[in-house]
């Protein structure tokens, strides 16, 4: 990673557009750092630790209300976070690594601010913007995609898609592979950052819109299914608080079994006995087209994500 940080110095991470997702990511990183530096810490690094880690943090927002929200959310952590209002260029100038977390339609304006290209020169820019490919971000800054930005001393853009579970360090983050490939140092740093807030996979850039739909929108999809199950249980006499706890733990347990290697179809079959209540419920779900509807929701969200990055307005209101 080309960086303005001096050899052996600490890295500074700045979050531009530090809203809900930015706060969640910072929360996960800061919680991890607190664990690492705690007395008698039992924390162990299972992945290769980069030679330089972010230890200083900047959060950039537009309003006093946003600044107050960040202060409140990050106050439990020992590592301080510097908050800058309405001065993205200064935040980027002071940083070595920049996380771009604004709304997709705001990216062009932010990256086009006077002095921004110079402030980002030689630095790493991690974009978590839905539907905005790295080529588009390069276009905002340079008018084209550089052949090899790291060797040319330009800003190096990497696209990543975490989700809202970052705040409890259970995110599923997808990192887009780059061409030419990232240096080992840069790749290690990006993986380390997102490993602090959950699991990480790397996939080709062409899959990022689908990854946005599955991992970024997925928590909302699963929450809707969870809510429906809770309502059904309440309708049959269970207290809502207990029904919510039971349903959430059941979903968590099913996910844990799949993550341990169990195929979803086999898991379903293991629970299903001839003439039993499970197959009866499954038949209702199949008759209602739940399988196809959920799959279509992921497909639709993929298309919408691709259009949002292009600045298309009202996408959801024009599709059938």
From Swiss-Prot:
Keywords: Amino-acid biosynthesis, NADP, Oxidoreductase, Proline biosynthesis. PROSITE patterns: P5CR (PS00521). InterPro entries: 6-PGluconate_DH-like_C_sf (IPR008927), NAD(P)-bd_dom_sf (IPR036291), P5C_Rdtase_cat_N (IPR028939), P5CR-like_CS (IPR053790), P5CR_dimer (IPR029036), Pyrroline-COOH_reductase (IPR000304). GO terms for biological process: L-proline biosynthetic process. The gene is P5CR. NCBIfam families: proC. Pathway: Amino-acid biosynthesis; L-proline biosynthesis; L-proline from L-glutamate 5-semialdehyde: step 1/1. PANTHER family: PYRROLINE-5-CARBOXYLATE REDUCTASE, PYRROLINE-5-CARBOXYLATE REDUCTASE 3. Belongs to the pyrroline-5-carboxylate reductase family. It catalyses: L-proline + NADP(+) = (S)-1-pyrroline-5-carboxylate + NADPH + 2 H(+); L-proline + NAD(+) = (S)-1-pyrroline-5-carboxylate + NADH + 2 H(+). It comes from Lophium arboricola (Zalerion arboricola). Its EC number is 1.5.1.2. GO terms for molecular function: pyrroline-5-carboxylate reductase activity. This is Pyrroline-5-carboxylate reductase.
